[in-house]
Amino acid sequence: MTVDILRGDIAALPSADRAVELLPAAEGDSLTLACASGELKSAYRVLRAVMDYGYAHERPARVRLVCADEDAYKAYSFQWNMWFAERKPEPENES
């Protein structure tokens, strides 16, 4: 399963808090969910649910997590990079 984390408009998207319910019902190869919370524990729970489902099922092959703001984006990106990413990003040099 591929997971994309990006920022964008979440107005018409289902909440990521419903991931456990929506993953089995996903039609096709992708599912897009809205991430509104910038809380690290919430981001971890959603990503853990997505990955646990992905380990056991072929579909959806891609999950897009659209974050409402910078705080949510940072929380989801941090948890993804910390626990799930195959390769860790290079540290940014603050020169």
Label the model's feature ranges.
Residues 1-17:
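N-terminal beta-strand/alpha-helix entry module and adjacent surface
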Residues 15-95:
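Phosphate/ribose-phosphate-bearing ligand recognition and processing surfaces
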